[in-house]
Amino acid sequence: KDFAVAGGGGESAMTVLKTRAVSGNPPSAAQIKGHDIQEWGGLGFLTNLDDVAEKGNWDGVVPKMVTDVMKWDGDFVAVPVNVHRVNWLWANPAVFEKAGAKVPTTLDEFFVAGDKIKAAGLIPLAHGGQPWQDATVFEAVALDVLGSEDYVKAFVELDMDVLSGDKMVEVFAKFQKMHDYIDSNSPGRDWNVATSMVINGEAAMQIM
């Protein structure tokens, strides 16, 4: 039986899942992200799926960097469903058409489109003012400004030259500018409510 847990970026769902698991009432399957699979594998809650993986030739068709995460102690214990990034831009074409704006492919294009959408009396960016959503937008801005190489240097290698450089100053300046395109009711808004704003044509875009 399906069950959904509202709120947050999955934190509430994980709390409910852990409570059910330790009380002896786990669901038959659950969506778990990335390296959390290793934690659940260590707790002994996951089932060996090697027979299914062998029939589907997962080791042969799925990249090793993905299968490594899907395994615990050398055995498949999770199904690779998709690989999802956080810098996706979701857009409502009808809102762009109404504002005479073009769906952006860069941050600078985002600001141009955002100005046109604001001028049309619509909300450019549907956003929820929650820490994890703010971090999602920050990551997207940082990737655009820094590029992939310096992004890795900054946030994986913690390279101080990049972290304290002019491009990082630009990251924070553009991140601050993003708030010019968010409505005043944003604080505390759940992500799914922001998504509904895009679907219903109240807002043009969401970064998620």
What are the residue ranges of the model-derived segments?
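Short, solvent-exposed loop/beta-turn-alpha elements that line the ligand-binding surface or hinge
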Residues: 50-64, 102, 129, 145-170
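Hinge/lid segment of periplasmic solute-binding proteins
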Residues: 34-87, 111, 137-139
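Conserved N-terminal structural module of periplasmic/extracytoplasmic solute-binding proteins
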Residues: 1-45, 54-60, 74, 103, ...
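Extracytoplasmic/periplasmic solute-binding protein
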Residues: 72-81, 87, 111-160, 203
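Glycine-centered hinge/linker elements that transmit conformational signals in sensory
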Residues: 114-116, 157-188
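Short, hydrophobic alpha-helical packing/hinge segments within bilobed ligand-binding/sensory domains
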Residues: 13, 17, 37, 113-114, ...
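Extracytoplasmic/periplasmic substrate-binding proteins
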Residues: 39, 172-208
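Alpha-to-beta junction loops
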Residues: 21-32, 121-124, 200-208
